[in-house]
Amino acid sequence: MQKTLKPLRLPQETATLDNGLRVVVHEDRSSPIVAVHIMYHAGSKNERVGRTGLAHLLEHLLFEGSENCPKGQFDRLLERVGGTNNGSTWLDRTNYYEVVPSHAVELALWLERERMGHFLPVLDEEMLDVQRSVVINERKQVYENRPYGLAYETLQRLLFPEGHPYSWPTIGYTPDLEAMSLQDASDFYRRYYAPDNAVLVLAGDVGVEQGFEWGARYFADLPANGGVRPSPAANGAGTGGGTQVLEDRVSFPRIYHAYAVPPYGTEAWVQLDVLSYLLADGESSRLQQTVVRDAELAQDADTYLYPTELAGIFGIVTTARSGVPTERLAAAVDQVVERVVQDGVSEDEVTGAIRRARRDHINAMASVEDRAEELAYAATVLSDAGRLDEILNQYERVTTDDVRRVAREHLGIDRRATVVVVPRREDGHGQ
């Protein structure tokens, strides 16, 4: 088999300030814009039982102003120069970014300096109460009141043992959010919002030396907090916690399978990603050919693989056609995976899956904003932005034996958590 693929490379240079902040610069002069991206090595996994949702709530609070930038001024300043900004929280990290014309980079850096070093003086009970309500409403709208909205948090709770840092959702639980105190928020901020727990990426129309100089100018005098590292000590392995059925306001049953697998950055993770594409991406993929098209058991079939730090999470999701029992669909999905284990896969299948995976990785780095986030994530969870190139170029080395092996080792039924979402009986539907 010939898999002569051009190596993928995302050029970058990294410097580390005396206070521990890593500054990564990716130069791309094709457009006069720059993405300024700050990522903190703290997400929902750094919370504790009883205070879930704290990382995400703090992200909301950190858009409410700072000591030298009053509430509302942050967005107004960026709008004046034609910039945009946003942030997000996930299991392993929290990130903030601005995309600005290249002449406005220093404004974005000053704003992020304010967020990192000058937030606590403005944090008060009123701000906390307002944002707590916003997040609780977000939970209701996005999860509790949306069809299938509670499936993934239930799946995480089944897959990982009680108290594991991945066992609760990033949005948190409402009772925990209601119990959150000002002290909780300030303690989390002090512990994790420090230069030695952050990565700054400048991507776009900026030179490497200029980027390093700006990073030092705006952040070098902010104090480190003593080499803080993410706190979870839990084993990354999941428990494969059985099956749970949820009734919801949905028209069709949906089956969610999840497996705890090796973490992002390992060769096995890349091999599992190829397996993911082979199973469900494209008309020629195994699940599309069998359960969707030939057997007509499912309306759709999808897979996913989270690039997470303590353990990867591999998922298979299928939506049943009208009248198809969930037991029959689940058995068909199991049979597809078992055939990979027993009979292996073809070189053509693996080559196609690799090419589709590379296509998606390339598309995911189309903008400087996307590239900044990818570099920041690699620098955060793998400790080196340069590891991104290494991972991207591992794909073409994946073999048929690799795919068969990781399916056998990591996708066993005994290692799996399953959530089945079915229509509520009062809706007049059955399985």
Residue ranges and their predicted role:
Residues 2-5, 120, 161-162, 170, ...:
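An aromatic/glycine/proline-enriched structural segment found at the starts
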Residues 46, 64-68, 117-126:
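Short, polar/flexible loop-turn hinges at active-site or ligand-entry regions and domain interfaces
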Residues 189:
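Conserved, carboxylate-rich catalytic/transport cores that coordinate ions
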Residues 24-26, 31-44, 53-57, 71-118, ...:
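M16 family metallopeptidases and their MPP-like homologs
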Residues 52-66:
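Active-site SXXK
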Residues 3-32:
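N- or domain-start disorder-to-order transition segments that initiate the globular core
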